[in-house]
């Protein structure tokens, strides 16, 4: 599972970067943005009906994001899609034998985004969307007990962040040399169903809060 997810993430990032490079032409206004981000996802503790809580460790998060500017000059409206996945899996801290000990996640979420001060150096924004969440176990056995962690659901996504104007150019790198590259810093919550932890929990939804930052490519 780990290798499959890593291959999917790397292929997706390579495809988006190549698409941006090939689409770059002249001095036309940039209507498209691709964000390549890395960070961590935090999930609050999950309460158990039998008592106690399921505590989850932070997990590495890798993401790719595409946005298309629809209209606006200083305040602009974008539509796009977010992809976020965990190449390193979410682990339960000190899991009991009946709890699924770890799982991987994947979120794919179309969204709308409103960006402010689009012509300034620092450009704050807010986004809202919804899509698909997938949870897959990487270990289905904890001790002598078989547990399952697989599950999928819908997700609501809401968050905010800030982009910067272009800061660097890779002039000596083929394909990338003409692309203006800025920075992106963001916090997003993917509010979704839960993976199957193997025990009954209080409620069936959870917050998956991603803190990420990285490069923003415009073309």
Describe the function of each predicted region.
Residues 38-44, 68, 83-89, 130-136, ...:
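Transmembrane beta-strands of outer-membrane beta-barrel pores
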């Amino acid at each position: 599972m780990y290798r499959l997810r890593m291959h999917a993430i790397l292929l997706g990032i390579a495809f988006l970067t190549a698409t941006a490079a090939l689409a770059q032409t002249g001095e036309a206004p940039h209507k498209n943005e691709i964000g390549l981000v890395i960070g961590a996802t935090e999930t609050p503790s999950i309460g158990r009906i039998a008592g106690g809580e399921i505590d989850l460790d932070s997990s590495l998060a890798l993401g790719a994001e595409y946005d298309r500017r629809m209209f606006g000059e200083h305040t602009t409206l974008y539509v796009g899609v977010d992809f976020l996945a965990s190449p390193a899996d979410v682990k339960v801290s000190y899991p009991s034998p009946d709890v699924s000990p770890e799982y991987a996640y994947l979120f794919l979420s179309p969204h709308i985004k409103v960006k402010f001060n689009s012509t300034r150096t620092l450009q704050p924004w807010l986004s809202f969307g919804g899509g698909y969440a997938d949870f897959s176990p990487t270990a289905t056995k904890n001790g002598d007990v078989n547990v399952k962690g697989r599950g999928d659901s819908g997700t609501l996504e809401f968050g905010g962040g800030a982009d910067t104007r272009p800061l660097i150019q890779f002039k000596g790198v083929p394909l990338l040399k003409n692309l203006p590259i800025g920075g992106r810093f963001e916090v997003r919550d993917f509010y979704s169903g839960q993976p199957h932890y193997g025990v009954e929990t209080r409620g069936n939804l959870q917050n998956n809060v991603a803190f990420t930052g990285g490069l923003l490519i415009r073309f």
